[in-house]
Amino acid sequence: NTKFVYAAKSERCHSEQFANFVQLREYKKSFLFETKSSKGKPIYHTNVVMSIADKFVVICSECFVNENEKKEVLDSLSKTHHIIEITLEQMEKNFCGNILQLKSNKNQPITVMSETAFEGFTEKQLSEISQYGKILAVKIPTIEKVGGGSSRCMMAEVFLPKI
């Protein structure tokens, strides 16, 4: 594990609390960056901007405000992960950054995403993602429309050892 942490500044993520979290959890390196939506406002949650899987990351670097922060984040991620860039439109309209890689009961990687995200990715992007395991697209339009989030907002990865 790299013990790196990435976060987008927003109403839900403040610099001081982020610094406390980094210290408490003993992260080796932290990246706090500013983002901007197509409406000019900060992106409300990091998991909308990016999804870090075991060997790949889906990220919308187009929404980064500061070029130096963008370069630092992409340089860091590219050392350990295959980077799959998404556009601002894919992030905002299709929830393409809001995906989650899990492991099956056979310890095989599965990338869970909504049908909206699946349909928003290009064939090339889906091909890249599928190199790292099966894709599972689920129909959750009500969650996306009413809740404003997608598949990653509904789950968390917990990789506990078997007892």
Briefly describe each language-model feature range:
Residues 1-163:
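The feature marks the mature, well-folded catalytic cores of soluble enzymes
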